[in-house]
Amino acid sequence: AYPDVCRQFRSGFEKMHVCIPMITGGKIGGVIQFLFDKKRFAIDGKDKRIYKAEQYVKESLSVIEAKRLMNTLRESALKDSLTGLYNRRFLQDHTETLIAGVLRREKNVGLIMCDLDFFKQVNDLYGHNVGDTVLKETAEIIKKCIRSSDLIIRFGGEEFLVLMLDINLGETAKIAEKIRSTIEKAKIKVSDGVIKKTISLGICEFPLETESFWQAIKFADIALYRAKENGRNKVVRFSSDMWAEKTYQ
C-alpha cells in the first residue's frame, strides 16, 4: 500500500522485507522493518511476529503522537510568536547547557544586545501592525548577518540578544558593526511605503570579561545604553569603567 515508504520494497536482494509504516496525523512518522531469509521464511499474511508488531505499532501510535504534540507545545513555548525567534524562557532553560559546552571547549561567547532606535515612534505614527513588520524584518536582517550556529533571542520589546558561540576575539565587534550598517542601509517595505531605521548595539564577551553569564548579559545591556547616550546608531563595547558608575548599578 505504501511502495515508496521503504526502498527495500524495490530492491533485488535475496531477502524478504516487510516494512510496517507508523502513520500519525496522516503522515508517516517511522517505519518498522523486518528482514527474513527467503529460503527459511514465506510470508502468508498470518505470521505471528508480524501480527504482534502490527499490534504494537497500533497501540504505541497514540503515545508517540502525544509525545510529539508535547514537544511541539514545548518548542512553541520557547519561541516568540511574532518573529519566530527564541524567547527569554529559552535562555533561562538552556543557559546551563550552553555555558557548560563553552567552558569545556575553553571558548568565548560573544554577546550583542541590540535595540531599535526610536521604535516607539513607529508604533505611534504608523500603528502596531507596521511596528510588527519592522520587528520581523529586523530579526531577518540580524539572522543574515550572523552564522547559522549563532542564536538570536527576542529579549523583550524591540530588544534582541545575539549569542555567538565559540567566537574568536575581536569578531563580536565586527559582526555587531555588520548588523548596525546593514540595518542602517535597509529599506523596510510597509503598506504605506518604506521605513528606514537604525539600531544601537552593546557588546560583551563571556567568560573573557566576567565569569557570570548573566552578568555578561547585564554588561552588554549597559554598553547598549551607553550607545544610546552617545547618539544612537552605534556599537559600544563594555568596559569596566561603565560598571563602576552608580547609574548602572
Task: Write out the residue ranges for each language-model feature.
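Catalytic-core segments of nucleotide cyclases and related cyclic-nucleotide turnover enzymes
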Residues: A173, S191, F206-R237, M242-Q249
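Conserved nucleotide-binding and Mg2+-coordinating catalytic segments in signaling enzymes
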Residues: R74-D93, C114-H128, K136
